[in-house]
Amino acid sequence: MSICHQEGELARAKKIDVAEQGLCCPSLVEAPLGEAEAASLADVLGALADPVRLRLLSIVVSEREICSCNLERPLGKSQPTVSHHTRVLSEAGLLVGEKRGRWVWWRVDEARLAEVRKALGG
């Protein structure tokens, strides 16, 4: 039984069965991760552990698809730096790039993002 010490009017100083009440502190995963799942998730989380990459991913998610040439200004980073960060996110499976002329257009790999959300319990 998962126990949460919730504060406030509802349960001041009471112990609440989280599973029964559906309240705070849910576990991140329903079952232990296998070795391959843990390694894959660690790669993704490592890629997201950088604030620039996290911002970059949020920009791509909000735009649905964006040219790498349009990432420099909002990130405040040079083209080589943007390329480095998009490569890391691409290698982690979060971004998919398509070369169009001299630029790469980026979009989020929705299936991979869904896998990550599921692994984290979301």
For each predicted feature, which ranges?
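N-terminal leader segment of winged-helix/HTH proteins
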Residues: 1-48, 92-94, 114-115, 119-120
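Short hinge/loop at the helix->beta-strand junction immediately C-terminal to the helix-turn-helix recognition helix
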Residues: 65, 88, 93-94
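Alpha-helical residues within the helix-turn-helix
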Residues: 72-73, 84, 90-91
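N-terminal helix-turn-helix DNA-binding core of bacterial DNA-binding proteins
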Residues: 35-78, 100, 104-112
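Histidine-centered divalent metal-coordination motifs
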Residues: 53, 84-85
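Intrinsic low-complexity/disordered segments
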Residues: 2-3, 76, 81-82
